[in-house]
Amino acid sequence: MALYTEEIADFIWRNGQIIPWAEATIHVNAVGHASVAGIFEGIKAYWNEEQEELYVFRLEEHLERFLNSIRMVRYGFDYTRQDLHEAVLELLKANEYRRDVYIRPYIFQKGLVRELLQAQPGKATELIIDSWPFSSYRDMNQALQVCVSSWTRISDNVMPPRLKCFSNYHNGRLAAMDAVVAGYDWPVMLDDRGKVTEGPGACLLLVRKGRVIAPPVTSAILESVTRETIFTLLEEVLQIPFEQREVDRTELYVADEIFFVGTGWEIMPVASVDKLPVGGGKTGPITLRIAEAYRKVVTGQDRRHPEWRTPVWEPGR
């Protein structure tokens, strides 16, 4: 997945101002964006060469999720969703992007590391919006070899997965490290009852007998914007039936197709689980159809749901 590149942006947005990327610094003893309390969001914008337009995909939904996470941790925060909307567009224009871009707003409390254990609702925050180019090319024939992790997925009453916070991702990182050391590409995580949840940073869907199946949002998963997009495409564009229900571990072993979905991952097929081939051991036909439909809608080739795409370079904006 070519999500992180060596390229950096010229500018970053910080607390209401566009500043040079190199000047966006904090002291080493500050809490920092990767602290326990840091909240973030992942958004993508796609360049359409034919239309000469950069589309931010489902910006409003991502900002709503960002604001919901901020609400849950009781941060002091004065920006509205419209303020954030305008800030994202301002940053993209400042960097003069005419290519695919990953956008990451994040927020953390001001202060020193030793203040982390002090409950301070409403404490002042730092708000940053970063961005960087990425390649959206994906070889759909390169499917993942995955395993079921021995690490249990965090739960809503422990560290709620609905909250998009940096610290939650350490749970998935532990599982991912174990998987890679064992020779796999990526793990699938189970909840404390042994039910399938998701992978680190991406939701999981499977296909059985022509029907797409997804664990419900109460299955220790992030409420995924990409997943909701896929559900709409399945119903309106592809006419493929789907359902949300609990998924057993052994269903992964008998699935016809399995794939991960997420803003960063987009659509990523799975070739095997615990060394057992999924379907024929290669990307399945329904996965390919979903990936094609998704690609068309995010780039504006499919003009349905224009409310999903916020144009950056549209005259008058």
What are these regions (language model features)?
Residues 94-101, 238-240:
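Short secondary-structure junctions
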Residues 80-90, 100-115:
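Short, glycine/charge-rich beta-strand/loop segments that flank catalytic centers
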Residues 1-79, 86-90, 117-317:
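Helix-start/capping segments and mature chain N-termini
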